[in-house]
Amino acid sequence: MRDEDNNKLILKRKSKLALLREVGNPFINNFKPENLAQNIIQEFKGFSKEELEKKNMQVSIAGRMMLKRVMGKVSFVHVQDSSGKIQLFVTCDKLPESFYNEQFKKWDIGDIIGAIGILFKTNMGELSIRIDDIKLLTKSLRPLPGKFHGLSDQEIRYRQRYVDLIMNKTSRNTFKRRSQIINYIRNFFNHHDFIEVETPMLQTIPGGATAKPFETYHNALDMPMYFRISPELYLKRLIIGGMNKVFEINRNFRNEGLSTRHNPEFTMIEFYQAYGTYHDLMNLTEKLFRSIALDVCGSANVYYQGNNLDFFKSFKRISVVDSILQYNPSLIATDLNQKNAKQTAEKLGIQIKENWGLGKIQIEIFETTVEEKLLQPTFITEYPTEVSPLARRNDDNPFITDRFELFISGCEIANGFSELNDAQDQAERFKKQVEEKDLGNDESMYYDADYIRALEYGMPPTAGEGIGIDRLVMLFTDSPSIRDVILFPHMRAEVK
């Protein structure tokens, strides 16, 4: 619809609103619906026309008017509430004198109404409500998108989510499913004896991940602060304090780019288990994902963007190096060693920075040639120590850590490891991160002296993991973009 036409309709609706104000309040707030459309349909759809007439069942409903057909003294209206739609049958003889012509006919699609009436079935067999009383609860001034074209512009859907939710059942179902998944995850960890906690969103030192933070300033304390990039270091402080199993579901903030898989503000669950290993967490994660598929989606086989993801089978487990060799059959193990890795990467078209060590080069090769090919649930293990500043070194090979990442449909969904609890080793790794930051890497970590102090009190052997809730919801709702599963995703400034 052109802006000019839209503005004309808005002016017309404002004129109707002025007339409605003269005869009453077009924003009534004392109507209490007792029924939902979908509940009514589920309970009474099996009744015959005669059975409904005998039952004389009165219901009351409130919602948005999505269709209105005036046929003289009779009108048909479709009302949509949070559960679905139902048809209303409105006749002038059931309403107060002159109400039908002077008020009801001035109502528009998009208005919010409340109605009381008796259930019946039309001659076509559609379950409907024969109205005894109907009220305007909110007059809508902006017209909804046309019923045939709906709201198809993706950018408008993201910017005006309120309209998207009105018009698109798929969007409504996506966010209902998101809520179900988060509740399921919370119950899953409660059932496994984890304690839910809350840690600071504003931090004096942003830690727990390699990412660029958002900065702010605390006026009363007269100090710079940062929106957290991860709760990890605070959750591990709780492990040190004796809380052996903790989890947190909350927002993280990373001052990075936008993509179909990245939003600067996103939801994660992080959880930590004392006396556990990264193997324990892989087992727990596999159980969690399989349970979500079965209990929330109804099947261990979940279709995502045309691919059948099998959550019933045991998830594949393979190391970083072995996965590179598997998906690059022309390479051999020595192509990835200290002597040859840089040349191998350059042959693959990867630009190498001078300060990169072997571990960073191997990860770049992995991300370039392997990551997007990991369709089925796969744990990638044995990440290099160089790119794992908070993970425990492997006992047999200090070049690698006891770390994994879970990939599904070519996307990283989870990251976990046995935690580094050697305070001296952690201090040295923090120092290396600071050196990288001084060289211009603004995603490197800060030195967190208080966390080192906490580690010096002793942290028990611990494993921890973070799972991206938004990406997980993408999988279980078949959503191609992270913006489809975040109610109000970040967008570039709107061009007026």
Curated annotation (Swiss-Prot):
It comes from the Bacteria. Mg(2+) 1 binds at E405, E412. GO terms for molecular function: ATP binding; lysine-tRNA ligase activity; magnesium ion binding; tRNA binding. InterPro entries: Aa-tRNA-synt_II, aa-tRNA-synth_II, aa-tRNA-synth_II/BPL/LPL, Lys-tRNA-ligase_II, Lys-tRNA-ligase_II_N, Lys-tRNA-synth_II_C, NA-bd_OB-fold, NA-bd_OB_tRNA. Its main location: cytoplasm. Binds 3 Mg(2+) ions per subunit. Mg(2+) 2 binds at E412. Pfam families: tRNA-synt_2, tRNA_anti-codon. Its EC number is 6.1.1.6. Coiled coil: none annotated. It catalyses: tRNA(Lys) + L-lysine + ATP = L-lysyl-tRNA(Lys) + AMP + diphosphate. It is found in: Cytoplasm. Gene3D superfamilies: Bira Bifunctional Protein, Domain 2, Nucleic acid-binding proteins. GO terms for biological process: lysyl-tRNA aminoacylation. Belongs to the class-II aminoacyl-tRNA synthetase family. NCBIfam families: lysS_bact, PRK00484.1. Homodimer. This is Lysine--tRNA ligase.
